[in-house]
Design a protein with these regions (language model features):
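Hydrophobic, membrane-interfacing alpha helices
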Residues: 1-227
């Protein structure tokens, strides 16, 4: 038992991603009928999702010019949907349904990555003026954001009431959250705005555009049925 605790403490990211994968697989198993897939395929999808998610956050960090060991959670926000689009086309599944089911899995994966930030001491908030050694709890605030989002979205996804809107709602909310919280995050810049503010705005715009398109499509389909 002691050896297990030591290994977990030495490799927190691997342990957290393993936990995230297990939770993701459980969710996919519960909703696999929505994806019309077998139980073993749901397991493979959960594992593949984590691996692709890790590659996404590392690739985006590389694009931003960070070092090889860095991660940027915007990578998951921007790159993972491309995987959903590809998977939906290859396996001939409705894209909205695929995105709805996998959005909580993505959120859990990013949550695990942010917990790793706390354990590894990176991505800290700015020092709070007048309070010696205490920083703004930006990472902890992000974890609360994820939890609230999951609490609000998962029941609706479970009941099939999101209609493909789970992902755009997530990226809109995340864009707003990150834009605000970045003012309190410690960055290697003296300017008020920095790169993450830009990506937050991009995230918000993507979410709005997708949400609007889904709403337009629904209205068009309803008009067609009423004729």
């Amino acid at each position: 038992m002691d050896q297990l605790i030591i290994r977990v403490s030495q490799h927190p990211l691997i342990s957290l991603l393993t936990l995230g994968t297990v939770l993701g697989v459980i969710w996919l198993e519960l909703l696999r009928k929505r994806l019309r897939t077998s139980w073993w395929a749901a397991v493979l999808l959960g594992i593949a999702h984590t691996l692709i998610g890790v590659l996404s956050v590392k690739a985006f960090a590389f694009i931003e010019g960070a070092d090889a060991g860095a991660m940027s959670l915007f990578g998951g926000v921007f790159f993972m949907p491309l995987t959903y689009i590809l998977g939906a086309k290859l396996f001939k599944r409705p894209l909205g349904e695929v995105a709805d089911v996998f959005t909580p899995v993505m959120v859990v994966t990013l949550m695990c990555a942010r917990i790793n930030c706390i354990l590894s001491g990176c991505c800290m908030g700015l020092p709070i003026p007048g309070v010696n050694g205490v920083r703004f709890p930006t990472r902890e605030a992000e974890l609360i954001f994820y939890l609230v989002l999951l609490i609000l979205l998962c029941p609706k996804i479970w009941r099939g009431r999101t209609g493909g809107r789970a992902y755009p709602v997530y990226v809109m909310a995340y864009g707003v959250f990150r834009f605000i919280v970045e003012f309190f995050r410690d960055q290697n810049t003296t300017s008020l705005f920095h790169l993450s503010h830009f990506w937050a705005v991009v995230s918000l715009c993507i979410g709005i555009s997708i949400y609007v398109e889904i709403s337009k499509k629904e209205k068009f389909e309803k008009r067609g049925l009423n004729k």
